[in-house]
């Protein structure tokens, strides 16, 4: 294997900090502190500005005290918490036949992660999920971790500014997130805390309507391109820019080994679509897919540490004819595979028929289920059609079954939806799926943006995030065109962080408003470096500014290259404010 080359170190003007727990003092919750410079007053005196603390997904890679070693993996911060609960055990070996086969294949030695765990954990009594604990009234360390993380130390600055209330549209956003609130939201099924007991490296996070809107980044190799090194680098790159979870959608060579490297080096939850690997195991022949191979794949991936599975269980055989009226048919890869299988075998899919057994497997490892939208609309013409809604209603039925087994559940959504149909989509989901968190791909609000689909989808993502979606799956500018590269991942993640942030502002999250408030203050005071550092992409902000005003002195200037020295409105504001203040004093 080639040597890994990942980007490390803090973003400009930032430093990693850790906040300790109260209920569980051993917790060290990571955050990013953006250092603010002083305001220079008219009389030349300095006024201190509060530093801004923001949510941080980058893991130890931005901690200057951490020595990165991808061959060792990131720290297993949850291992002792899991051990202390006493409800799991170490298996004697891998339960998956395929996992054992890969482990014993000497030809894979050079590709294999060196420290593979050959004795994964499983629940002693069949269930070790955060949903089960929450329903028992238990507050776990993961729940307090999440509460601290969501608050971002906002209490330290809350009295210094006037927060906008926002319009939460039915969401319930408390002034302060408590561990008990986290527990209650999970218990009600309105939020999930994806945390496979075999992924102790993951830093707990939460996905739910009443929390900050999260984003997911898709990575993964294809039969045509990419390597293990490239996919690990993409994963680390995505979390550096703010991906809350990462889905490995690999369909090329060495899927098992690629996933192991990603999980062991990931501080965020990892999701997959197990059906993809199952299809690879039968050499792409849909007709040969069966429950036994799929079941083995679920166990294989659960024992590696995958935190959530996209499973297309809601696509029923009788739904398939509804797609014949569509302009673009079935565009979901998983959906098209299931539809093909159902049509060939003239029966319900093995996934639907064995759904309860799937839930029992997932409960053993605390793998959350993301109920896939195999019938999502692939164009504006097909939005909110009969096929999409029929599947969505089935997903609601499956949600109740998953909850019966204490399996954490989220619902996947579209797709391509014009702006005037987005709110209706959200309302149907909330009712049909009993308030379970919604996880949407965009939606794209137009079909004509090839090369710019990260923008057309972010428009829809910001709206549906405001209306109630809990997590947004990013879309890159390569959507519909090709496999995204490293820079496409960055562009997609930052674009979706913006969409999520816009939704948080609209819903009235105080932490979102504080960052905007401080950015506006820095902008009016011509504190250029603070503006750069508060940006979602500080490096690009610096690059754009310095392209026309590169000298260090220009970072103190009271103008930029857009308006120049004589046409800067903020500079003019300062001048007439000074005059008005002087007149007021003289009177």
Curated annotation (Swiss-Prot):
EC number: 4.1.99.17
Coiled coil, from the record: none
Cross-referenced Gene3D superfamilies: 6.10.250.620, Radical SAM ThiC family, central domain
GO biological process, one term: thiamine diphosphate biosynthetic process
Amino-acid positions noted as binding [4Fe-4S] cluster in the UniProt annotation, renumbered to this chain: 560, 563, 568
Pathway: Cofactor biosynthesis; thiamine diphosphate biosynthesis
Named cofactor requirement(s): [4Fe-4S] cluster
UniProt family annotation: Belongs to the ThiC family.
Purpose: Catalyzes the synthesis of the hydroxymethylpyrimidine phosphate (HMP-P) moiety of thiamine from aminoimidazole ribotide (AIR) in a radical S-adenosyl-L-methionine (SAM)-dependent reaction.
Protein name according to UniProt: Phosphomethylpyrimidine synthase
Lineage, opening ranks: Bacteria, Pseudomonadati, Bacteroidota, Bacteroidia, Bacteroidales
Gene: thiC
